[in-house]
């Protein structure tokens, strides 16, 4: 069974789509809570390593059949860690690319499907400590596109899903999941 990782920039509707489907169970690492508790720093390399460590553990558990019993959806994953590593100046672009290549070479992305959500909710919101970065969504989106292309070049499946923030988008999302 595949591991489905739902990725995309802030305000693309990822979490809404994931929470409103009942096809597969969902795992969402409580990054904001963990970050706030330990507070390694927004631009700290430690923040990148914390996220990367979580990703390595998740993918190793999956590869060792601990999680392969059924399809699992992960709300944000290795692409987000790489994008935000560069976006928040925690790591250089070259390191993010190298991290993704290493993940691929280690087989950590075998039988993984990336579902990258595209769309932007234009309403203002107060969600978390990262709200101030919403003005840079274009930059974030560019990095998601760049890293998704790299994963495709490495032979991994990336499905781009347009979210129009309507009931039809949710229906199509559920149908997409059922067809994976």
Protein language model regions, located:
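Hydrophobic anchor at the beta1->P-loop junction of P-loop NTPases
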Residues: 6
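NTP-dependent small-molecule kinase module
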Residues: 131-180
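Conserved substrate/cofactor phosphate-moiety recognition/catalytic segment
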Residues: 16-66
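The conserved Walker
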Residues: 10
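Glycine-rich phosphate-binding loop used to anchor ATP phosphates in small-molecule kinases
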Residues: 48-107
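A glycine- and Lys/Arg-enriched "phosphate-lid" helix/loop adjacent to the NTP-binding pocket
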Residues: 88-147
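Conserved glycine(s) of the Walker
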Residues: 13
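Pre-Walker A (Motif I) flank of P-loop NTPase domains
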Residues: 1-3
């Amino acid at each position: 069974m595949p591991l489905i990782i739902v990725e995309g920039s802030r305000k693309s509707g990822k979490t809404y789509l994931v929470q409103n489907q009942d096809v597969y169970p969902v795992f969402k690492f409580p990054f904001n809570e963990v970050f706030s508790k330990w507070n390694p720093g927004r631009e700290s390399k430690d923040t990148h390593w914390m996220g990367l460590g979580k990703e390595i553990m998740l993918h190793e558990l999956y590869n060792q059949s601990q999680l392969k019993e059924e399809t699992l959806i992960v709300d944000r994953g290795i692409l987000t860690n790489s994008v935000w590593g560069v976006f928040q100046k925690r790591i250089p672009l070259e390191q993010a690319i190298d991290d993704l290549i290493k993940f691929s070479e280690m087989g950590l992305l075998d039988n993984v499907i990336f579902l990258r959500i595209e769309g932007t909710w234009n309403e203002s919101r107060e969600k978390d400590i990262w709200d101030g970065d919403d003005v840079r969504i274009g930059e974030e989106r560019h990095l998601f596109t760049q890293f998704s292309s790299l994963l495709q070049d490495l032979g991994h499946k990336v499905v781009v899903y347009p979210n129009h923030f309507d009931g039809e988008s949710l229906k199509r999302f559920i149908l997409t999941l059922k067809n994976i």
